[in-house]
Amino acid sequence: MSNRIISILKKRLARKTWDNWFTTFQVKKVTDDKIIFSVGNLFIKDWLQSKYGSVISKAIKEAYGKNLDYEIVYETTEPEAFNKSNESYKGPLVKKKPLLISNLNANYTFENFVVGPENRVLYEVSLEISRNPGRYNPFFVYGMVGLGKTHLLQAIAHKIMELHPEMRVLYITSEQFMNDMIDSIKYGSVRDFREHYRKKADVLLIDDIQFLIGKNGVQKELFHTFNELYDAGKQIVICSDRNPEELNGFHDRLVSRFQMGMVMEICPPEKDTRFKIAKKFAERESVSLPDDVAQLLADSVDGNLRILRGVIIKLIVQSSINKERIGAALTNQILAAFNKTTVSIKRMKEEDLIMSTIEAVMGVSPEEIKGTSRKQNIVLSRQLLMYILKRHHGKSIKEISKITGKRHSTVIHSIKKIEMSVIKGNTVVKEKLAKILNTMATSSAAG
């Protein structure tokens, strides 16, 4: 009977689909009320559950004449990253099928990425890269924490594997790249490490590249990996919390490589987009979020989507436990709790965090920033505040003018001043900006 399920699936699915996703799919165990299938790849397990669940259920019903629950398990012995005995690198690329990599989140797809006008062009470029890998190369995406960079990066990986199943797609964090390099040195497998990253990947996607700031040895290895992949026409996609010019502590030659292709910013979602995202997050948890609650969340929570999702999850859990309707009262209660612990709720004013960080780094108080002093250090602090508010937090010129008490023309001039300093490689400005951003990132992570 178990063979019958496999036969039914083969008939229902296109040959290409079967070859791409079902070659390791098999029946492991059958009980009176449940069937357990096994696959040889963790990503395939998640992919089959999310994309082919209904097909599998129908095949079970056809084979057994009734509906049965099923489970897909991943069964394989977990290899060591580097095997000391044979010095053979056992990285995350699947050799039997040119799929992948490290784990991808099955929810991080283009279909689940809510697109607003602020990121429409970025979305379309990402789709085009998925359709035609190598067209925009490299592709560098930057933006503040929690805006969906990882989602977008993994969506590109998912789509390339869907449209180009023959391609080997490697998604990693920069920390993973560093750890793999360290292991290769430890176990004498540097050659295998380089073979893995430079020869076996058709698409390389690296998340959180800013992690490698100051890590010169790893940057050198990445530089040569980048060059070899680029020269071979392989697609490279990189994400960072800041634009390439602000990667202070990176080799100039590596920064210049990042700037060779398409560099785009992912912007904080506007209020209408946050409303749609809130509805989407709840829908993913099988909950229909009332419009007034979604609007309240969109009004109250800033662009950090991790915080927005956290509020929604807590809202759903508390509603379920207390048998309480999801409404404005419960939402306000949960927002108040988050308000005590995070700066991502608008009532806590992100500009206060930036100004307090500038005070710690530059020794200039918020009062001095908002004042009229023309002392060089105060003017620079004021300009850095305006630049960060605009480029990293998506504030409008009008909003920045209101926060700082300065005229629109002053705000525009200040932002352009910092932009030009960064582009021209002004060491003082780049170092101060990097220190402020790093301090803020550390504070956010600690919170």
Swiss-Prot record:
Cite the binding residues for ATP: 146, 148-150
The record, for Pfam families, names: Bac_DnaA, Bac_DnaA_C, DnaA_N
User: What keywords sit in the KW lines?
Assistant: ATP-binding, Cytoplasm, DNA replication, DNA-binding, Lipid-binding, Nucleotide-binding
Cite the GO molecular-function annotations of the record: ATP binding; ATP hydrolysis activity; DNA replication origin binding; lipid binding
Localization: Cytoplasm
Annotated region described as Domain I, interacts with DnaA modulators, given as residue ranges: 1-66
What InterPro entries has UniProt attached to this entry?
AAA+_ATPase (IPR003593), Chromosome_initiator_DnaA (IPR001957), Chromosome_initiator_DnaA-like (IPR020591), DnaA_C (IPR013159), DnaA_dom (IPR013317), DnaA_N_dom (IPR024633), DnaA_N_sf (IPR038454), P-loop_NTPase (IPR027417)
One GO term (biological process): regulation of DNA replication
Q: Which residue stretches belong to region Domain IV, binds dsDNA?
A: 320-447
SUPFAM superfamilies with a match to the protein in the record: P-loop containing nucleoside triphosphate hydrolases (SSF52540), TrpR-like (SSF48295)
CC annotations in GO: cytoplasm; plasma membrane
Region of interest: Domain III, AAA+ region: 103-319
| Subunit-structure text | Oligomerizes as a right-handed, spiral filament on DNA at oriC.
State the family it belongs to.
Belongs to the DnaA family.
Instruction: Provide the domain comment.
Output: Domain I is involved in oligomerization and binding regulators, domain II is flexibile and of varying length in different bacteria, domain III forms the AAA+ region, while domain IV binds dsDNA.
Q: What is this protein called?
A: Chromosomal replication initiator protein DnaA
Q: What is the lineage of its organism?
A: Bacteria, Thermotogati, Thermotogota, Thermotogae, Kosmotogales
